[in-house]
Regions:
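Short, well-ordered, aromatic-rich surface patches in folded extracellular/luminal domains
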Residues: 1-30, 55-63, 68-145
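Short acidic-glycine loop/turn motifs at beta-strand connectors
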Residues: 39-45, 101-105
């Protein structure tokens, strides 16, 4: 399935990323999170939740990242989702979903397959976010691959 979504315009105030393996076989094969949610706020506060295959929260973490990393994440995400793209989704694979809220309160939502290359200026957004928040097994867009 492919869809064309609106291009992000504005200044990001909040990012929420949900990485969901609940429809994919690999969430059942390992003792891992079936779904993860990370929220990065403009004040650099971060909320992380990991859920099991039963949908119950297995773990959570609240932290604050440095303002420089938060700014870079917001810039990279705005740059990536600020370009027109065709999005494809396989319903039997893991999917990611991102919700961006701009400074005027407008919400933008995008989704894709886990494993997609989501890069800005040659830098993997998944790797940069993992390093910035200090959660090494964060799925984000690439599924921690």
């Amino acid at each position: 399935m492919k869809n064309k979504l609106s291009v992000f315009k504005g200044i990001i105030e909040r990012i929420e990323i949900v990485s969901d393996f609940s429809n994919a076989e690999n969430s059942l094969m390992y003792n891992r999170d079936s779904k993860q949610r990370i929220i990065i706020n403009n004040d650099a506060s971060v909320e992380f939740m990991g859920y099991g295959t039963d949908g119950k929260e297995r773990r959570n973490k609240t932290l604050t990242i440095n303002q420089k990393d938060k700014t870079r994440i917001f810039e990279m995400v705005a740059g990536y989702f600020g370009k027109e793209r065709n999005w494809g989704i396989a319903l039997d694979a893991g999917i990611w979903e991102i919700h961006l809220t701009d400074s005027e309160g407008k919400d933008y939502a995008y989704c894709g397959m886990i494993g997609d290359e989501v890069e800005c200026d040659g830098i993997s957004l998944s790797e940069f976010i993992r390093e910035s928040v200090g959660i090494g097994d964060l799925y984000v867009f690439d599924g921690e691959e």
